[in-house]
Design a protein with these regions (language model features):
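Gly/Ala-rich beta-loop-alpha elbow adjacent to hydrolase catalytic centers
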Residues: 70, 85, 89, 93, ...
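Helix-rich "cap/lid" substructures immediately adjacent to catalytic or cofactor-binding pockets
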Residues: 2-88, 166
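A broad detector of short, well-ordered amphipathic alpha-helices
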Residues: 34-35, 68-75, 94, 107, ...
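Alpha/beta catalytic cores of group-transfer enzymes, especially the acyltransferase/condensing modules
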Residues: 11-13, 40-42, 101-201
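Short acidic, glycine/serine/threonine-rich loops at helix termini
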Residues: 19, 99-101
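A short small-residue
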Residues: 49-56, 96-97, 185-191
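An amphipathic alpha-helix/helix-turn recognition signal
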Residues: 31, 65, 91-92, 104, ...
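Residues within alpha-helical segments
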Residues: 30, 37, 71, 78, ...
């Protein structure tokens, strides 16, 4: 017998216009944004649905936006009669998963994200950095390249047997990414404000 699990994504997955159609179609999805805006104190819909990218990509906006969109999708799925046997989240997605699982209220979830996003935005402004997803190499090889690269760059997320995310100083990350490109492996720059999951936070 199969089971349904809802997985909530982390930061870097945001794009202008996300969840707009869900909110137009599902009252339960729209209600998520109502709650978020009450807690946050600003028009999250405008930032999420209309952008611009420069505003949405700010950590203080992208984290609440991703959480709201994730929970909106969860509520839309439930409205369609889909049931879930469990939930899980990656990084930022852990907070949405806690709300979906009933561990914290949606109001408290957005209060937590508001504080988290503000703290991470402050850290990002003090210590700029980058993140790259390295695809097609075992983690051990990614670790080796990072160790051989001058400057601060380290593996921070072990997403699968052949996908590892690296983070660190921008110059070091770019140098490591160039080495992976020479090996004909994908090095995808993540759409985040700093080197999350690293000591720069």
């Amino acid at each position: 017998m199969s089971k349904n699990i809802f997985l909530f994504s982390g930061q870097g997955s945001q794009y202008v216009g996300m969840a707009k159609e869900l909110c137009e179609k599902y009252d339960a999805a729209n209600a998520v944004f109502d709650t978020a805006e009450k807690v946050l104190g600003y028009d999250l819909r405008a930032v999420t649905f209309d952008g611009p990218d420069t505003e949405l990509n700010k950590t203080v906006n992208s984290q609440p936006a991703i959480m709201a969109c994730s929970l909106a999708a969860f509520e839309a799925a439930k409205a369609e009669g889909i049931t879930f046997d469990g939930v899980a989240g990656h990084s930022l997605g852990e907070y949405a998963a806690m709300v979906a699982a009933g561990v914290v209220t949606i109001e408290d979830g957005f209060k937590l994200i508001k504080a988290r996003a503000a703290a991470m935005q402050k850290a990002a402004e003090a210590n700029s950095g980058s993140m790259y997803a390295i695809i097609g190499l075992p983690a051990e090889e990614v670790e080796k390249i990072c160790e051989e690269t001058e400057g601060y760059v380290v593996p921070v997320n072990y997403n699968s047997a052949v996908q590892t995310v690296i983070a660190g100083d921008t110059a070091a990350c770019e140098a490591a990414a160039a080495k992976f490109a020479e090996m004909k492996k994908k090095a995808i720059k993540l759409n985040v404000a700093s080197a999350f999951h690293s000591k720069l936070m």
